[in-house]
Swiss-Prot record:
The presence of a 'disulfide through disulfide knot' structurally defines this protein as a knottin. GO terms for cellular component: extracellular region. Residues 23-57 form a propeptide. This is Omega toxin Ap5. Its main location: secreted.
Length: 103
């Protein structure tokens, strides 16, 4: 009789602990889900904009580029080479020249 009570007590204890943990886990996951939804609604647009505004891979100075789709970095422009590279017949990325506006 005494061993049956100990076994029954152990089973009830194990069930109580597992059910209690399941309730805590479900509460944590529901709270986590709510926080993720709130974060997505608040910062979703901002993250999307910052991802798209990031500069993609680009070509630097003296790298061949396509005239129609240059692919040069912001501070460079796609120009036909003058001087030593004119015989290659392709365009290259060169640093943009500072243009002074006369007043």
């Amino acid at each position: 009789m005494n061993t049956i009570q100990v076994i029954l007590f152990a089973v009830v204890l194990v069930l109580t602990v597992t059910v209690g943990q399941a309730d805590e886990d479900s509460a944590e996951t529901s709270l986590l889900r709510k926080l993720e939804e709130a974060e997505a609604s608040m910062f979703g647009q901002y993250l999307e904009e910052s991802k798209n505004s990031r500069e993609k891979r680009c070509a630097v100075e003296n790298v061949p580029c396509d005239k129609d789709r240059p692919g040069c970095c912001r501070e460079y422009e796609c120009l036909k080479p003058t001087g030593y590279g004119w015989w290659y017949g392709s365009y290259y990325c060169y640093k943009k020249k500072e243009r002074l506006i006369s007043t």
